[in-house]
Each structure stands twice: as structure tokens, then as C-alpha cells.
Amino acid sequence: MADSGHSISVTFPSFHSGGKEHIIRTGCGSVSVTVCGDQEKPPLITYPDLALNHMSCFQGLFVSPESASLLLHNFCIYHINPPGHELGAASIGIDDPVPSIEDLCDQILVVLNYFRLGSVMCMGAMAGAYILTLFSIKYSERVTGLILISPICKAPSWTERFYNKLTSKTLYYYGMCDLVKELLIHRYFSKEVCGNPEIPESDMVLACRKLLDERDSVNVWRYLQAIDSRRDITEELKSLECKTIIFVGDSSPFHDEALQIAEKLGTNCSALVEVHACGSMVTQEQPHAMLIPLENFLKGFGLYRPCRYSNSPRSPLGPSSIDPELLYPEKMGLKLRPIKLRVSPQPRAHKN
């Protein structure tokens, strides 16, 4: 794949103040990257699931004061959007070659080289988790650690292929219609928030439906084609050298695959967090459930929440402000596998 030649930078109204969008040209099309935070800090890259961008996939986590203080204190965030999934994206030409899952993986290398990043922390959800895991297998020296949300590792099952085919054909001929939105909503969320004849949908799901209306159907179709052509990387997981934490809702259609990934990685360098009554998108549905496991995971890299947040009574992280349930994860329905981390290469040095 050809390396990036040029980039366009524009001010971007993000849920992080000061975020800037960069459009980076790669050998298989352009990719949008929104950079948030101090670029002198260690980098964390994110990659979302099908039909989502960084805001609709990760906003719940990053707008939480507790999680935001932990992540933005320690990292500069590079939100990578799938081609054509950024806000206001134009429709990619129907005759343009559809990138493979390997192409999307290699685009990440172009992004890292463009920003002159060395080893990065990675956070991905569902299809985005697959792409970042594949990237970690291919370019292990460029990955410090993995934060995976409802990850997948196998080729599509017959059931998934059926739904992908249905979604693909409907997108192609009818666009982002109600059927497609319904299929995607149940991919993302648990029945607890999707509603029923007696209980209305949650505001979160209603907001997601509205965001899906803004997605370009051709661009979503192209991402789906790449996802549907993925290969099984289960056996290659054994070669992963980086520390990994996995979050998965027990109602996620990818729950079993997430457990299999955790089993393949073993407990020496991975941790599994199962969230009760939650779908695939833990970052949106139950972001508070990620806080303590994330904090413990990042401690293995020498990273921490800033003292000024954790000790100040005015801070959202002050003891009087923390929901008592956060101190006792089992009360939130979390099943935690002990985090056993062995020594491995540390993230890029923090520059003062």
C-alpha cells in the first residue's frame, strides 16, 4: 500500500474540545482521523464498528468525567473513522474499488506513519476490534496494548452471513431504511434498552437511530463488504505479544467469540470483563462499567488517574462523588477475571 502523501486539517466540532480532523490519503482511499489532546502524550487510537464513527461509538465513554480524566490525562486520542463514516462524508463512488479488511488494517499503518507515531494503545469495537487485532498481529512492534469491546475473531458464521447479505442488499437498493437500522440497533444494544410494546426505546437508542439516518448508505455498504470477507484469525491470537483487556456485554451477539479470544490469549497477559444486561456497545450502554477495569489495566503500563482529580472534593473523581457501586463491580453485574499482567514493552515515554 502506498504511504500517505498529503493531509487536509480542519477544525472539527468534537466532544473533545480542540479536536482537529485530518483527511489522510492512502493507497486505497482517504481516511478521516480526529486528533484530540496533547500530541506529546502517548497515543491511543480508536476504530468503530459498522455504520458508526468515533462519536456514535465511543462518546459515552469519553464524555464520562471519570473515564475522560483517565484517558485524556494519559493519552492523545487519534480517532480513526472507516472510509466515508466521518460527519458530513460524501458518498464514495460506487465504481471505486471496495477495500478489503486487510486494506483497512494497512490504512492504520499509514495513519501512524503520517503522525510519526511509534507504538500505540488501541481501542476498537466489534468490527473495529477485529481490524485492530489484525493490525496487532501484522505489526506487533507498533502496538503497546489492546482495549477490545465485544471483539470478533472468526470468519462470519452462516447466520451472520445471512444477516450481512440481507443488510447489504437492502442498503444497496433501499439505503438506510428502517429494516437496516433495526438490524444494526440489535447488533449494538441489549433488549433492555431497545424497548418493547410496553416499554419505549431508551434515549440512547433513539439518538443512535437518528445518527444512522446521517450515514451514507453506499459508504456503510462498502464497510460491510470488507467485514463480510474477513478471515478467521483465532489461531493467530496466540502470537499476540501485547497486554489486552476485553469488555463484552452478556447480551452481545459476539459474546461467545469474545470469550474464545480471552481463552486463546490466556490470563497471563489478558483480562476479561463481562457486563450483565448489556449489548455489544459497552462504551455507550454501560461506560461506567469500564472505569475500574480500565484503570487497573492501565496501571500495568505505569499510567494512572491524576491526583488532582482523585483527591479533590470538587472533582467528579472525588470519593464523595463516585457512585458507591463503582467501588464494588459485582454489584453492577460485572464478572471480572483477575488481571494478571506480565512485563512487556512499555508505552512511549511520557514527555513532561
Curated annotation (Swiss-Prot):
SUPFAM superfamilies from the UniProt entry: alpha/beta-Hydrolases
UniProt note on tissues of expression: Pollen.
UniProt family annotation: Belongs to the NDRG family.
Protein name: Pollen-specific protein SF21
Organism expressing this protein natively: Helianthus annuus
Organism lineage string: Eukaryota, Viridiplantae, Streptophyta, Embryophyta, Tracheophyta
Underlying gene: SF21
